[in-house]
């Protein structure tokens, strides 16, 4: 009875999907077609954005699922693609007419369970937006952006449009890591700063999505594998064999969708070696979560409330994440700070200063890795009002 009610509720929602696709040769693999076939069951209309080019067969395949096909230069990754779509391709009245918007891309295999079942389960969560996986590291938390669903309040209030318009230049010119900051963390920070609630299909998960896909799948129930897990710098046959064995024995997902991609791209034959169940249990038991920052988000936000003028120490990935996720709480961002006298002039459009050139008693968030933070601590901790993401002993 309850399942029938849930299905009815899900089916009554007017939902559009926005799919971002990239493949260097424009080839549309079978796993992509499977994903689109699954999504067809849950969306009323599908828009497809292609970064780069499509081969003829790829175009024919995508046209089976949508004639709303937008091909653009391959710049800015998926964040740039969505920004381009909202700013240049779609009428704002059309996009705000939907009850829900799903943005997703082709950077993963799966889902290995029914997409309809995922939407039915998440219909029980009274949240404004959700995704597959929420990563909680005390600060700079976020929902991974390869599959995001935005509900009515966000859609009708045109929040996505405003975000992508405001950050269009950064997103369309971003490197991969800048995209992770400006799109993934930035959009999450923007929405949560405005009071929108969020949820995720997988709860309490801090395992590395690239190096521990088996733990994410078997222990946490994450129904996808990121394509990058097959890259040579991340590839572990024993880890992936655990995933593949789980998929074969526990799901209806066709493992050949992954095998065929692997054989085409890497020109290697994928041969599953049976994994001993005790070894799997031990591997899952001993998996180490991603380390968390020592500072709490409450303490970070209190620091921002109590201090108007803020510098962020660093001009790398962590500093970018802090800026994009918490910029809405910063009254006056003075710029980024680095140790080197020879440095870039600007980062995300903001000034970059040598630490020796900023006034004494400046308010600084030290957004560096633990070792680098320890190296700079003695030089700044007695001169400035500082907040470190990690506990540092002086």
Describe each region flagged by the PLM:
Residues 2-294:
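ER/Golgi luminal nucleotide-sugar-dependent glycosyltransferases, focusing on the catalytic module
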Residues 283-394:
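Hydrophobic, well-ordered beta-alpha structural blocks that scaffold small-molecule cofactor pockets
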């Amino acid at each position: 009875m309850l399942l029938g009610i849930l299905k009815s509720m899900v089916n009554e929602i007017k939902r559009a999907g926005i799919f971002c696709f990239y493949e260097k040769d424009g080839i549309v693999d079978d796993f992509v077609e499977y994903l689109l076939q699954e999504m067809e069951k849950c969306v009323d209309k599908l828009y497809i954005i292609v970064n780069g080019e499509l081969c003829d067969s790829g175009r024919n395949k995508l046209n089976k699922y949508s004639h709303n096909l937008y091909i653009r230069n391959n710049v800015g990754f998926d964040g740039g693609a969505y920004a381009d779509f909202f700013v240049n391709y779609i009428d704002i009245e059309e996009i705000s007419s939907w009850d829900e918007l799903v943005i997703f891309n082709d950077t993963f295999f799966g889902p290995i369970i029914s997409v309809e079942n995922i939407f039915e389960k998440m219909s029980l969560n009274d949240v404004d937006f959700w995704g597959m996986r929420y990563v909680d590291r005390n600060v700079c938390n976020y929902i991974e952006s390869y599959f995001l669903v935005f509900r009515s309040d966000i859609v009708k209030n045109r929040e996505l449009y405003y975000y992508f318009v405001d950050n269009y230049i950064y997103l369309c010119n971003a490197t991969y890591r800048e995209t992770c900051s400006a799109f993934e963390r930035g959009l999450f920070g923007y929405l949560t700063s405005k009071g929108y609630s969020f949820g995720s299909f997988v709860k309490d998960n801090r395992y590395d999505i690239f190096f521990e896909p088996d733990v994410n799948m078997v222990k946490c129930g994450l129904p996808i594998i990121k394509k990058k897990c097959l890259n040579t710098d991340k590839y572990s046959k024993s880890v992936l064999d655990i995933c593949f064995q789980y998929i074969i024995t526990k799901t209806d997902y066709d493992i050949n969708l992954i095998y065929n991609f692997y054989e085409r791209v890497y020109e290697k034959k994928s041969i599953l070696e049976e994994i001993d169940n005790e070894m799997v249990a031990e591997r899952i038991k001993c998996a180490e979560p991603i380390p968390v920052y020592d500072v709490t988000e409450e303490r970070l936000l209190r620091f921002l409330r109590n201090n108007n003028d803020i510098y962020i120490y660093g001009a790398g990935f962590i500093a970018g994440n802090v800026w994009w996720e918490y910029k809405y709480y910063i009254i006056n961002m003075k710029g980024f700070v680095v140790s080197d006298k020879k440095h870039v002039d600007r980062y995300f459009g903001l000034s970059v200063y040598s630490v020796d050139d900023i006034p004494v008693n400046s308010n600084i968030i030290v957004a560096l890795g633990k070792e680098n933070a320890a190296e700079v601590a003695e030089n700044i901790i007695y001169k400035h009002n500082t907040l470190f993401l990690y506990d540092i002993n002086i």
